[in-house]
A protein has these predicted regions:
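A cross-family "folded-core" feature that marks the main globular domain of proteins
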Residues: 1-270
């Protein structure tokens, strides 16, 4: 307790208290994370933390981030960062993606947009959760990837206007198709629609495989009915339809969803 309070004092946070054998703390986890990030120079990152930070930086940060910026933020040498990047590239290959050094300064995650979205979806599902109150969605953090990934940029995915629109679209499509799904499937579809709404203007999906099959499904008609905006391409409508068709497999935990992504990726490689 004394050691914890020592570090809390450095961060100018309230101390832990023990009363009748119960530890109490008057602050919140979000406040602690905010304070730690303000004093990030005091922290030494583990290898796993560094790799998660790098992936999320290049997925979510909107402004260009140079290799030097990452090295300074993480407080590591160029050699250490190079080894981290090698491991990250190996991980990204499971999503058929790459970390490209196009101008010798900034790294970019490259690959098919559908695979980029699968990685985004996988990260959002692990790091955020949803609950419902008075027919509204409440978004909370799980901190699965730790406290130092770019939370602010990730939180932008949950802008209230976009969140409300995604929720309305999902409920409308489910009602149109008279479809009941599990809570896990609802979360997957809701988060995918958020990814779609955040990315389609700059990273549009125009064509996908099995277009004829997908366009003749009832799910497609429901998607098309509620995504009437002309800016949505046929590829976007059909990709969302594909997720709805797969929603019956989203009945387990996130690891099951992750396996589904990996299996589909493996099949695409054949």
């Amino acid at each position: 307790i004394d050691d914890c309070n020592y570090h809390l004092n450095i961060l100018k946070l309230p101390e832990l208290n023990i009363k009748k054998g119960i530890i109490t703390f008057s602050s919140t986890l979000d406040t602690v994370v905010e304070k730690i990030n303000e004093n990030i120079y005091l922290y030494s990152f583990s290898q796993d933390e560094r790799e998660k930070i790098i992936i999320n930086f290049y997925l979510f940060k909107k402004e260009p981030t140079t290799i030097e910026d990452i090295s300074i933020f993480l407080g590591v040498s160029a050699v250490t960062l190079k080894n981290d990047i090698k491991r990250i590239k190996k991980y990204l290959k499971t999503f058929m993606l790459n970390l490209s050094n196009e101008n010798n300064k900034c790294l970019t995650i490259t690959g098919d947009e559908r695979n980029v979205r699968k990685l985004l979806l996988d990260i959002l599902l692990k790091n955020y959760d949803i609950t419902f109150k008075n027919d509204e969605i409440i978004i909370t953090k799980t901190y699965y990837h730790g406290f130092f990934i770019p939370w602010k940029e990730m939180d932008d995915f949950f802008d209230k206007a976009i969140t409300d629109k995604a929720y309305k679209l999902l409920k409308g499509i489910l009602k149109e198709n008279n479809k009941n799904i599990s809570d896990e499937a609802f979360k997957v579809l809701f988060f995918y629609i958020l990814v779609l709404l955040n990315r389609y203007k700059d990273h549009e999906i125009t064509t996908i495989k099995n277009m004829n099959f997908l366009s003749n499904t009832p799910e497609y008609q429901g998607v098309k009915e509620f995504l009437k905006e002309p800016e949505f391409s046929e590829g976007e409508l059909l990709t969302l339809t594909e997720y709805f068709l797969g929603s019956n497999t989203f009945n387990f935990d996130h690891s099951f969803y992750g396996n589904w992504v990996q299996i589909e990726t493996f099949i695409m490689q054949l």
